[in-house]
Amino acid sequence: MILSVSRRTDIPAFYSDWFFKQLEQGFVLVPNPIAHEKIAKVALEPLKIENVETNLLGEKKVEISGNIEGIVFWTKNPKPMLNKLNKLKDFKYYFLYTLNAYPKEIEVNLPPLDERIESFKILSKYCPVIWRYDPILVTEGIDENWHIEKFEYLTKALKGYSKHCKISFLIESYKGCDKNLHKPSIWQKDKILSAISKIAKKNGFQIEACAENGYSKYGILPSKCIDGEIFEKLLTEKYKDLNIQVKRKNNKLDGQRKNCLCMPSVDIGQYDTCFHDCKYCYA
């Protein structure tokens, strides 16, 4: 099982102490996001290889314990969790770090940009960090040229600390989206994608689209944020002589967008508990 921490709120930013208490007790109780009276108990035991036996034909029989194949953290501010990451030594994990350069009027309660960039660099010493530049939106004072300028600044700042950047465009229909924020027009999208794909390549980043397709002409391919292949790579690094595969299912979870390629996961967050107060909230 892949644990999602969390699409619904920013646990690293606001609830890191709570999260590690759940790890210590070995399980977490998760209310159903729709039917709150329904509570799921989710075990939190890291996947471990307990024993490997090899028969006369050279075939390996592997005994595995634990249920968590990996953890995906979603955050805009991992700083409160940075001094606790040693507690994750038995788990495989990576971070999806949303890092934009929007003004305080849009991303109200985030730390200063330079501080968030520094946190990104520190975090990258512990685990893979995937940069999310999303959602891309336009409003008064923020147009396609603004995005190109800010993206270049961020790309240069993060060069060498990550290799992947996931993008998506604003979804205006989300209930948390301010009516003054808009999705770029077709020609604005074309200009943005043309420019940032070149900037990314120059600085060692591969841009990938989250739940969107049709950008292959820019060298931008669809991708999955919750990616079993990343965990297979991490597990293979630890157990080099074993071919470990993360369990995959093709079925989508409720709420996943049409073009979302994420593998199923269990999310342990709760809606309406994030205090960033972003004016485009997509939780």
Q: For each of these PLM feature ranges, what is it?
A:
Residues 115-176, 195-211:
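Conserved C-terminal portion of the radical SAM core fold
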Residues 8-10, 76-78, 98-102, 134-138, ...:
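Active-site beta-loop-alpha junctions enriched in small/polar residues
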Residues 1-107, 113, 117-122, 283:
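Conserved Radical SAM active-site core
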